[in-house]
């Protein structure tokens, strides 16, 4: 027979009571926090997995936010190009295309000068549209979103359109003759004699003839800048393509998205073989200048050369307008891809969130049930304690 003593009973009771109290408090904490664990030590395996999921979730959420900003930026860009495209493709009553059709006919008469002014005004309006912003950044400024991309330099008929400080009508410089090493350019003095003395060198030799060294270097610098902005400059964004760097620390281009929009890739830059601008705004501005030279009363051309130039530029304007439409369509495709990528990132976020909640969060119904049972057990322990204390007190009185 096992002898039950008062001290033994109290000791067992205290142990069970403490355990019931701990279980109740733990169940209460779980119900309040709605988490399965609150420290790494409580469940190291689950905590490590939750950390990995949380890191992936934060990265995906960041990619989604960046992509959302890019999507809205492209929406602004698309709407702007839609407006510009309508202006140059005869979709509005004051479109540049309609003006050119009028200008090519011989029925303008005294309205030629007014039409020319409208053409120049339209060119100015296109530039203002292309200087649109999304938030604090200019949409068509490439990687330099803080500074206005397009601006006019000069006044009147001599004004020139510049993109980020570089004239858009800069012509690609011709190749220059090189020395025997195939790298160093040949230089010539004022008499056209080849010289290696830098102090006497004033010209390079090209297929088009002699060119001033300073002028050529300036032209090449400007052309290289335009080429870099149009084809080489990038504004990378992590949109969930697995952004990674190579061994030199450079971002692998295929792992990021280039979200920089260069205005000159849409409007054009440089000059063609005839020396005419490729930029659609410059062409429209030049057409307006030619019309404004016409006689204010009769509308006659200022010269036969002006009429010939106008006809030549009118055809090139139509070609530039067609290229602008193609670029607009291309942007539509890019915008659709970004939207599709956003949908994928949203789906990834939802999946990670579901996995994350499955590891860290408790089922609320189970938590309430566990707490209710723990509370019940604790209350029973208190009642048992009352019985034990009462019996002990009676034993004490009876002794």
Regions found by a protein language model. Give the residues of each.
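Amphipathic alpha-helical polymerization modules
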Residues: 1-146, 292-399
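Polar, low-complexity export/assembly segments characteristic of proteins
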Residues: 17, 24, 28-31, 35, ...
